[in-house]
């Protein structure tokens, strides 16, 4: 019998990054897939709209990552219809017959869900004290961020990071007026 594969360890960390600069863009276009004959989608939208904001700052918490620059691209494109309206029951894992799967824990049946890994990824830039990341959020979230950016100072980026093996996921991201390390 082959040895069982070890599950990668999962670690969580809260990052606090005082915002030092930002750049924003708003896009509108004819959907590039509407004219692309190589790709066929059932019913693509004709127009494509998006808003993105790039947030930059130097991490000040936790101490072992203090002084490292972070650049996070927050994209407000809704790729799939209703992607951000999904409910946990929509992600219930099903067997080959389409029946929901449950695990028994102490005699109680607990549903098994296929939860997304995160909103986006964070990667270390090799050889530098710099990190880059991206995440997908609803267009409304990016619009709300753009309302805060020119009017409120100081602002902080709070990232709840989820590390699975060597991959770092953005589990949660917020732009806030209070320092996340002191909450």
What are these regions (language model features)?
Residues 1-104:
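OB-fold ssDNA-binding interfaces and closely related basic DNA-contact patches used
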Residues 17, 46, 72, 101, ...:
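Weak global preference for isoleucine
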Residues 111-156, 160-167:
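Acidic, glycine-rich flexible loop segments
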Residues 22, 122-124, 178:
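Low-complexity, intrinsically disordered/propeptide-like segments
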Residues 82-132:
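Short acidic, glycine/tyrosine-flanked loop/strand segments centered on an H-E-D-like triad
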Residues 1, 155, 173-177:
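Aromatic-residue detector
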Residues 162-183:
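OB-fold/S1-family single-stranded nucleic acid-binding modules
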């Amino acid at each position: 019998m082959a040895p069982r594969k070890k599950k990668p360890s999962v670690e969580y960390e809260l990052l606090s990054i005082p915002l030092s600069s930002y750049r924003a863009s708003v896009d509108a276009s004819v959907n590039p897939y509407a004219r692309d004959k190589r790709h066929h989608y059932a019913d693509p939208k004709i127009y494509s709209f998006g808003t993105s904001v790039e947030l930059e700052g130097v991490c000040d918490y936790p101490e072992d990552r203090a002084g490292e620059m972070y650049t996070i691209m927050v994209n407000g494109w809704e790729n799939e219809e209703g992607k951000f309206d999904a409910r946990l029951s929509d992600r219930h894992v099903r067997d080959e017959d389409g029946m929901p799967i449950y695990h028994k824990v102490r005699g109680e049946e607990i549903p098994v869900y296929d939860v997304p890994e995160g909103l986006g990824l964070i990667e270390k830039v090799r050889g530098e004290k710099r990190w880059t990341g991206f995440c997908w959020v609803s267009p409304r979230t990016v619009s709300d961020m753009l309302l805060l950016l020119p009017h409120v100072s100081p602002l902080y980026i709070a990232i709840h990071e989820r590390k699975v093996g060597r991959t770092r996921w953005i589990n949660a991201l917020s732009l806030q007026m209070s320092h996340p390390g002191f909450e």
